[in-house]
């Protein structure tokens, strides 16, 4: 959105961003929203109750390691159309929602937004997928959902290093190094995510120490953010600002701990 664009100067080519969150906060949905915002030139504005122009259509690839393609497609259409995802899943639409869904589906079809599944991936798989997107579709924006270990990547790392039982933090750090290298090598923007460790529940400061598996991942990123549910203390602190400006109460807060 415009606020984060102001902080980071947008999705810059040759830059590697990391946005982490606890389970269930919405890492995938936030990433899908960003991918659609870059690749699609229209979006339904609920406040204006009409479709509005959304800039240019930039070639974008969304790489999923957990979600199925149909799940991702549903989330994309829900975001573009402004229709509750539950309505798409149940087929029970309110007035004019079906027309918006049909229009959003056509918009998505005509946009340079490509989805690739990598359920059990290696570093070579990630690299090949990005390179294929660049070669076949001139992709400039890459969304990788999300950094974690897999059996295939553990086997690959063991084979390359000759070291058995390599710690998870080392493997995750190696993935982040390769992703940053790909940013520079192919002049693309990459956004990825990680889970948070349990310390986020009691933390007073939200930074790389909350990243699950390896805080060293943050060494290679150009922007680091943590998404959390807004607490009652947060809402209390914002109460005056919300009332004075007529803002809606936020459900999510974002802490930016690195920005270069």
Give names to the regions the model predicted.
Residues 5-6, 41-138, 208:
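Cytosolic-facing regulatory segments adjacent to core modules
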Residues 18, 140-143, 191, 225:
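Structural motif
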Residues 22-23, 65:
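P-loop (Walker A) phosphate-binding loop of NTP-binding proteins
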Residues 30-34, 72:
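Hydrophobic positions on the alpha1 helix immediately C-terminal to the Walker A/P-loop
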Residues 12-17, 58:
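Pre-Walker A (Motif I) flank of P-loop NTPase domains
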Residues 112-185:
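Phosphate-binding/switch loop-helix module in NTP-utilizing enzymes
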Residues 1-13:
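Phosphate-handling catalytic cores of nucleic-acid transaction enzymes
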Residues 24, 51, 174-260:
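Phosphate-binding/switch region of NTP-binding enzymes
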């Amino acid at each position: 959105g415009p606020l984060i664009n102001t902080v980071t100067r947008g999705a810059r080519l040759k830059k590697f961003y990391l946005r982490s969150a606890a389970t269930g906060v919405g890492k995938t949905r936030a990433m899908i929203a960003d991918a659609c915002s870059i690749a699609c030139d229209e979006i339904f504005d609920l406040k204006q109750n009409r479709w509005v122009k959304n800039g240019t259509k930039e070639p974008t690839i969304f790489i999923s390691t957990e979600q199925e393609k149909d799940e991702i497609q549903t989330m994309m259409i829900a975001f573009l159309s402004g229709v509750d995802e539950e309505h798409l899943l149940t087929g029970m639409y309110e007035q004019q929602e079906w027309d918006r869904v049909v229009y959003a589906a056509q918009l998505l079809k005509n946009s340079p937004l490509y989805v690739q599944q990598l359920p059990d991936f290696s570093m070579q798989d990630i690299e090949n997928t990005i390179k294929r997107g660049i070669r076949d579709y001139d992709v400039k924006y890459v969304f990788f959902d999300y950094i974690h270990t897999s059996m295939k990547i553990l086997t690959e790392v063991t084979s390359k290093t000759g070291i058995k039982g390599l710690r998870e933090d080392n493997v995750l750090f190696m993935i982040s190094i390769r992703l940053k290298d790909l940013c520079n090598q192919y002049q693309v923007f990459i956004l990825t995510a990680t889970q948070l460790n349990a310390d986020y529940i009691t933390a007073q400061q939200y930074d790389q120490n909350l990243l699950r598996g390896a805080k060293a991942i943050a060494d290679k990123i150009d922007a680091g953010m943590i998404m959390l549910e807004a607490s009652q203390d947060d809402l209390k602190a914002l109460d005056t600002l919300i009332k004075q400006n007529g803002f809606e109460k936020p459900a999510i807060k974002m802490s930016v701990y690195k920005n270069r």
